[in-house]
């Protein structure tokens, strides 16, 4: 998993599988896009204005996400620094 935050744009991008080909993108809400592969597995999530509550529960219930990735996504969303995202470059999270 790789997490990147673009401060200028206010966009968080979470890559679950690097190099995986994205077949389609689904808009979950006004500020959340989910990239899927041809099997319907989540390959990436883009969150505009990530300081808001974004629909992680809906993403996890609607799409295929590995258990380890789901756990890390929950930690990212609810951790002590959630909503702040002070990092400007890639943050590599090892599962």
Regions found by a protein language model. Name each.
Residues 1-95:
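Small, basic N-terminal interaction modules of short regulatory proteins
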